[in-house]
C-alpha cells in the first residue's frame, strides 16, 4: 500500500518541478533580499525626522495594515486580470513607493510611502501563491511550496547583512537598492512568466466557471482549519519569537545582544535545512501528518521557553521554532492548494490575511500580557491557545489526492 501511494504521489520519479515554481522562487528571493535590506534601516531613518518610538512603530504597522486591508481587493484583481499582471503591477508599486521612501523629506511622507508599499506587497504575495497553487498538482505541491518558501528564506537571511553594509554609506541607500531588486523581480515575472516563454499550460486568467467562491470555501473545514493554524503559527513566530522572546532572553536568561542575533540566525539556517525535507514529507506522508509535526514542534519551542532557566534554552527553542515554522508554513499552504488549486483569488487572499492578522495582533496582545502579568504567563497563555492546532490538525481529513 505504501509503495502504491508513493508511486501515485511521485509520478515524476525525479520530482522535477515546473518552470513556474523556480521563476516564482527567484522572484521571492529578490523581494525578500530587498526587504531584509531595509529592515534595519527603517527605524534609524525614521529617527532622523525627530520622532518618538511609537511613531516609528507606526511605520512598521502601516505596511502590515495596508497589506491586511487590501488582501481581498487584491484577490478580486487576480480574478479579473490574472496573477501575472497583478504580480508585476504589485512589484512595481512597491518599487516606486520604496524609491520614494528613500527620497522622503518628512516623517509623514515616509509613513505614506510605506503604506503604499503594503498595497503592492499583498498584490504580489497573493498572486504568487495563486499561480504557484495552479502550476502544480498534489503529487509535488509540498516540494513546490518548500522551494518557494526557500527562496524567501535565503533572501531574508542575506538581506539584513547587505542592508547593514549599505546603511554605512547612507540610510537612504538600502531603499534605492531594494527598489532595484523589485524592478528585477518585476522583469523576471513579466518576461519569464509570459505565455510566450511558458506556453499555455497555465492560462493567464482563470476561467470564471472554475473559480471557487469565498462563501463556498468557508464551508470547508480543512480551509478554515488551515487559516486558524496559519494565524496561530504566526502568533508564535512573530508575536512571541520575534517580539517578546528577545527581551525575555536578555532580561531573564542573561543572553547577550550577539547571542540574540545568533539565535535568529540558527533558526533561519535550521528552517532552511528543514525545508529541503518538509516538502517531501508533506507529499509522501500527507498534509495532516506534516501539520501535526509542525504544531507539536512549535509547541515544544514554547514549552522550552516556559521552563527555561539559562540562556542556552533560548537556542533550543529557536531550533524548534525553525523546524516548526518550516512544517506549518509549507503544509498549511499545501492544504489550500489541494482544496482549490489556486482557483479563486479572494480565497487565497483570505488565507494570507489570517496569517497577517496573527502578525499584527499578537505583538500587541502579548506585550500587554507581559506588562500586566510578566513573561511566563504570556508564554503559558500562548501555549494554551496554540495547543488548539494539534486538535485542528488531528481532525483534518487528508486533502492530498492520490488519484491525481
Question: Could you describe each region identified by the protein language model?
Answer:
Residues 4-18, 195-226:
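Juxtamembrane intracellular "pre-TM" segments in multi-pass secondary transporters
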Residues 64-72, 156-157, 268-276, 359-360:
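Residue-level signature of mid-helix packing/kink "hotspots" within the transmembrane helices
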Residues 41-53, 243-258:
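Short amphipathic helix-loop junctions that connect adjacent transmembrane helices
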Residues 113-154, 339-341:
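Cytoplasmic helix-loop-helix junction between adjacent transmembrane helices
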Residues 69-105, 282-288:
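Conserved MFS/SLC helix-loop-helix module at the cytosolic interface between two early adjacent transmembrane helices
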Amino acid at each position: 500500500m505504501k509503495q502504491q501511494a508513493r508511486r501515485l504521489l511521485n509520478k515524476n520519479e525525479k520530482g522535477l518541478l515546473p518552470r513556474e515554481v523556480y521563476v516564482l522562487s527567484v522572484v521571492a528571493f529578490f523581494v525578500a533580499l530587498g526587504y531584509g535590506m531595509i529592515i534595519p534601516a527603517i527605524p534609524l531613518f525614521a529617527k532622523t525626522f525627530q520622532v518618538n518610538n511609537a511613531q516609528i512603530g507606526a511605520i512598521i504597522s502601516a505596511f502590515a495594515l495596508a497589506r491586511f486591508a487590501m488582501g481581498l481587493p487584491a484577490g478580486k484583481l487576480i480574478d479579473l486580470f490574472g496573477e501575472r499582471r497583478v504580480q508585476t503591477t504589485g512589484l512595481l508599486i512597491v518599487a516606486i513607493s520604496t524609491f520614494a521612501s528613500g527620497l522622503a523629506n518628512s516623517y509623514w511622507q515616509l509613513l505614506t510611502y510605506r503604506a503604499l508599499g503594503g498595497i503592492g506587497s499583498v498584490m504580489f504575495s497573493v498572486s504568487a501563491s495563486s499561480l504557484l497553487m495552479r502550476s502544480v498538482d498534489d503529487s509535488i505541491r509540498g516540494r513546490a511550496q518548500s522551494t518557494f518558501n526557500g527562496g524567501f528564506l535565503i533572501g531574508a537571511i542575506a538581506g539584513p547583512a547587505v542592508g547593514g553594509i549599505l546603511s554605512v554609506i547612507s540610510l537612504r541607500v538600502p531603499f534605492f537598492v531594494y527598489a532595484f531588486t523589485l524592478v528585477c523581480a518585476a522583469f523576471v515575472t513579466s518576461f519569464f512568466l509570459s505565455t510566450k516563454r511558458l506556453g499555455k499550460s497555465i492560462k493567464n486568467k482563470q476561467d470564471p466557471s472554475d473559480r471557487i467562491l469565498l462563501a463556498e470555501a468557508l464551508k470547508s473545514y480543512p480551509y478554515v482549519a488551515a487559516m486558524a493554524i496559519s494565524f496561530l503559527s504566526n502568533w508564535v513566530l512573530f508575536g512571541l519569537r520575534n517580539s517578546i522572546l528577545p527581551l525575555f532572553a536578555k532580561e531573564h536568561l542573561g543572553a547577550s545582544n550577539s547571542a540574540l542575533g545568533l539565535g535568529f540566525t540558527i533558526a533561519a539556517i535550521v528552517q532552511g535545512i528543514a525545508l529541503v525535507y518538509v516538502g517531501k514529507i508533506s507529499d509522501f506522508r500527507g498534509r495532516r501528518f506534516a501539520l501535526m509535526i509542525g504544531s507539536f514542534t512549535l509547541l515544544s519551542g514554547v514549552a522550552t521557553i516556559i521552563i527555561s532557566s539559562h540562556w542556552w534554552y533560548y537556542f533550543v527553542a529557536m531550533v524548534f521554532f525553525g523546524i516548526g515554522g518550516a512544517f506549518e508554513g509549507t503544509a498549511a499552504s499545501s492544504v489550500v492548494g489541494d482544496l482549490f488549486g489556486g482557483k479563486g483569488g479572494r480565497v487565497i487572499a483570505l488565507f494570507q490575511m489570517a496569517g497577517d492578522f496573527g502578525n499584527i495582533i499578537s505583538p500587541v496582545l502579548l506585550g500587554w500580557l507581559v506588562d500586566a502579568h510578566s513573561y511566563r504567563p504570556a508564554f503559558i497563555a500562548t501555549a494554551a491557545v496554540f495547543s488548539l492546532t494539534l486538535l485542528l490538525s488531528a481532525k483534518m481529513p487528508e486533502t492530498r489526492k492520490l488519484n491525481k
